[in-house]
């Protein structure tokens, strides 16, 4: 018996980290060009991505800093109104493990409050830069979160333990190979090159009946040639009727039921 709901062989979890200019507000606040790059997300990329998801008939998850909610409210309302999930991603893309305990607690409160202002009670959390520590686990438990998407030690969801103790959280694993940012923004690879990385990884995981967790950033993947590549990859994956495309919440709910 497979891991996935009846009729599905594998899972393709497409998600977006909707950072906009959140990190630049504290990293490079006087650099107008850097700030403008983040604005490409709400102005251009997110509308294109939402239209693409509509065409592909996929609902997915946007991990969103509170700053983005506060500064691009209409965009978040559009995401929610189209049936997508919004999950937590700090307040201003802070490096959480480098903060004091007091500052981290403040960031968590600001993040939750901002999400609530757009009508969202977040169920999942992804740490900026995947800098994820014990304090974050404790805050997630305190605040009633259901899942984490931060760990890199599996290619199928699992019940997250820390120091041998069950946290009560489902983990939706991640991997830098399956993140658009380092390939496009750091290594400056072309869409065809990235496709040649992602396609065999997807095919291999599908063959094994596993989980393919792809992390994209609107201001990065939303450029026309890159978005066409993503559409090609997802369209090819959808050709079979045995691939599940869930939101993070749907995936964590299923894994929790399956594993407990």
Predicted regions and their residues:
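Short, well-ordered coil/turn segments that N-cap beta-strands
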Residues: 8-12, 56-60, 81-85, 119-123, ...
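The substrate-binding groove and active-site-proximal loops of carbohydrate-active enzymes
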Residues: 33-40, 59, 63-66, 91-102, ...
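Active-site beta->alpha N-cap acidic-glycine motif
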Residues: 1-82, 236
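Conserved, mostly hydrophobic/aromatic
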Residues: 17, 53, 86-89, 125, ...
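A conserved mid-domain beta-alpha-beta active-site/ligand-binding segment of alpha/beta enzyme cores
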Residues: 168-202, 206-208
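Generic structural signal for well-ordered alpha-helices
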Residues: 46-50, 73-77, 105-112, 137, ...
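C-terminal domain-boundary segment and adjacent tail
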Residues: 6, 55-56, 147, 159, ...
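Catalytic domains of cell-wall/extracellular-matrix polysaccharide-remodeling enzymes
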Residues: 71, 95-174, 221, 225-229
């Amino acid at each position: 018996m497979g891991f996935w709901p009846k009729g599905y062989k594998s899972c393709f979890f497409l998600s977006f980290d909707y950072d906009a200019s959140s990190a630049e507000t504290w990293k490079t606040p006087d650099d107008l060009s850097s700030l403008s790059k983040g604005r490409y997300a709400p102005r251009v990329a997110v509308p294109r991505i939402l239209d693409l998801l509509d065409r592909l008939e996929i609902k997915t998850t946007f991990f969103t800093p509170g700053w983005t909610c506060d500064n691009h409210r209409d965009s978040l309302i559009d995401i929610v109104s189209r049936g997508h999930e919004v999950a937590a991603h700090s307040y201003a893309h802070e490096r959480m493990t480098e903060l004091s305990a007091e500052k981290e607690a403040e960031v968590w409160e600001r993040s939750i409050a901002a999400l609530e202002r757009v009508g969202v009670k977040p169920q999942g959390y992804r740490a900026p830069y995947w800098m994820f520590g014990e304090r974050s686990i404790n805050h997630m438990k305190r605040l009633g979160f259901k899942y984490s998407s931060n760990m890199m030690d599996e290619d199928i969801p699992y019940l997250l333990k820390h120091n041998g103790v069950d946290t009560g959280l489902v983990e939706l694993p991640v991997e830098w190979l399956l993140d658009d940012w380092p390939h496009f923004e750091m290594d400056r690879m072309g869409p065809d090159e990235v496709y040649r990385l992602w396609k065999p990884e997807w095919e291999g995981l599908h063959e094994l009946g596993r989980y393919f967790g792809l992390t994209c950033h609107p201001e990065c993947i939303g450029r026309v040639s890159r978005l066409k590549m993503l559409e090609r990859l997802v369209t090819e994956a959808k050709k079979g009727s045995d691939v599940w495309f869930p939101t993070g919440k749907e995936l964590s709910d299923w894994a929790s039921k399956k594993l407990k």
